[in-house]
């Protein structure tokens, strides 16, 4: 608990002095005022996040956290639970969607086992993935708490520790996840923290039909009624209806914010983790970059609660960190506008009136 408390205490808002300096330069770039729109907004944020007019973003790390969920027993996913471990191996071997798009972004992918149901020790022993394993999957949240409060703290602190471990190797973090049925706890978290109903926060996940979606909503409603999570206590929400990988991602976000490093939030599950981070440390939102708007129904509700506009809208619903990977090149573009584009004075170009 001490690491969580000290990390939260270290999270400060963006550097307003550097933001003012960056704004002054961006206002004078050789184009009609703010003609590159939200890319300039992003450049401004990067300066404020890092406290630098030369924000570093070259060393990129996507942390894909894996975990299983007891609520999968309720039939809320189109895929069996063993797919979690199979896809972890696929990512580790470079064959997954995130593996491919990370190569495009010149980013490294680090998979972390937070609590998969299967044995991933061979991948851990070979150095292909890291283990911060808490248990072989959460308990079924439809029947009781998904985890203990102590396990919730452990998951958060594992994510913080990952951020600290890679602080010297990464300028820019991205979030990713792998866990069959993890849209179900994510919908529960969004319903609680974005002040929505279970129906409003629940989509079709891996591609279930409408009848199964209605069943999924009923399972989430049962979990909320059974556990009565306190929406004003992010730790209670995580313990009662969360997941180990979701807690790990929330901790990663807190850790990045404490380090003043930008972190790109991937899709629906990652955004649920971001809501938990916001609940625990509101200033952590200052370091989040929303990668994309997925087609998962509750994602827009979560983004609105964070006050974030996503960079991309490509009808994604995969997770893994795929949207975060694609957004990394936009982040680089924003940084380069701040550091490489000439001002009117530098280029001897006349300004408009």
Curated annotation (Swiss-Prot):
Main enzyme class: transferase
Disulfide bonds: none
This protein's UniProt keywords: Cobalamin biosynthesis, Glycosyltransferase, Transferase
Active-site residues annotated for this sequence: 320
E.C. code: 2.4.2.21
Pathway linked to the protein: Nucleoside biosynthesis; alpha-ribazole biosynthesis; alpha-ribazole from 5,6-dimethylbenzimidazole: step 1/2
UniProt catalytic activity: 5,6-dimethylbenzimidazole + nicotinate beta-D-ribonucleotide = alpha-ribazole 5'-phosphate + nicotinate + H(+)
GO function term, MF aspect, one: nicotinate-nucleotide-dimethylbenzimidazole phosphoribosyltransferase activity
Xref: Pfam families: DBI_PRT (PF02277)
Alphabetized NCBIfam families for the sequence: cobT_DBIPRT, PRK00105.1
Role: Catalyzes the synthesis of alpha-ribazole-5'-phosphate from nicotinate mononucleotide (NAMN) and 5,6-dimethylbenzimidazole (DMB).
Protein name from the UniProt record: Nicotinate-nucleotide--dimethylbenzimidazole phosphoribosyltransferase
Native source organism of the sequence: Syntrophotalea carbinolica (strain DSM 2380 / NBRC 103641 / GraBd1)
Gene giving rise to this polypeptide: cobT
